[in-house]
Curated annotation (Swiss-Prot):
The record marks G27, V28 as: Cleavage. Mycofactocin is classified as a ribosomally synthesized and post-translationally modified peptide (RiPP). The post-translational modifications that lead to mycofactocin involve oxidative decarboxylation of the C-terminal tyrosine residue catalyzed by MftC, introduction of a tyramine-valine cross-link, removal of the modified C-terminal dipeptide by MftE. The released dipeptide then undergoes oxidative deamination by MftD, glycosylation by MftF and methylation by an unknown enzyme. This is Mycofactocin precursor peptide. InterPro entries: MftA (IPR023988). The gene is mftA. Belongs to the mycofactocin precursor peptide family. Precursor peptide that leads to mycofactocin (MFT) after extensive post-translational modifications by enzymes encoded by adjacent genes. Mycofactocin acts as a redox cofactor of nicotinamide-dependent oxidoreductases encoded in the same locus.
Length: 29
């Protein structure tokens, strides 16, 4: 349970970071 939760959290964090980085670079959103 803990391992799965940690993995999901990391994936979500990476996705959010990527989205923020893309938005910041493009400046479209």
């Amino acid at each position: 349970m803990d391992y799965e939760t940690d993995t999901d959290t990391e994936l979500v964090t990476e996705t959010l970071v990527e989205e923020v980085s893309i938005d910041g670079m493009c400046g479209v959103y």
